Amino acid sequence: MNLNSIPAFQDNYIWVLTNDEGRCVIVDPGEAAPVLKAIAAHKWMPEAIFLTHHHYDHVGGVKELLQHFPQMTVYGPAETQDKGATHLVGDGDTIRVLGEKFTLFATPGHTLGHVCYFSHPYLFCGDTLFSGGCGRLFEGTPSQMYQSLMKINSLPDDTLICSAHEYTLANIKFALSILPHDSFINEYYRKVKELRVKKQMTLPVILKNERKINLFLRTEDIDLINEINKETILQQPEARFAWLRSKKDTF
């Protein structure tokens, strides 16, 4: 399978996974126009759409795309039923698309019904995990989001994190505000800054590296714990996650 990305809105990525025959699955098409343009340019044959959650910038193009390609199957959690989903999916489900098996797992936090799609090495995680960060808690609790991130963190080292937004630079700036002397984060910041100056994307990222630069995946890391302890003593990783998320919300 081949991974492709289509920029949308100000900072969204619509991911498109294709096979050698040109059949494709489209992930979180927030708008239809750039997808239709890419389909025409590459002569792709859309087979399915994956929806991770119900927010407009992830589902806004679904109904128009279905008008052009009514044969497509649209997979999504229950919260996307009125957004164009034709087949509802949830935690533990498996589906077969493009001849490959995708495993679904629930990742509540950003929204209550958020799901991720995984077919090694590709993880389509919507707004749950970003490079260097995680989604805002619009509907879920810190505990839910922490558990969702731990599900992702348990995946193989070579998992490719296909997030839906280009937030990496801002997220790394936040990480450095907490751990300013972390050598790996500083090195990553320089690389990301160079990419963004050239208007190049920073995604996808490998989970093995993400574990080093994403503080939300490092809540049991001694350096981070020591830094948090300067302000407050928090015994549980979930509490440290909630502290970080609160700090990021006002950063």
From Swiss-Prot:
EC class of the enzyme, as a word: hydrolase
UniProt cofactor(s): Zn(2+)
Keywords noted in UniProt: Hydrolase, Metal-binding, Zinc
Pfam families in the record: HAGH_C, Lactamase_B
Enzyme Commission number(s) of this protein: 3.1.2.6
Subunit structure: Monomer.
Protein name stated in the entry: Hydroxyacylglutathione hydrolase
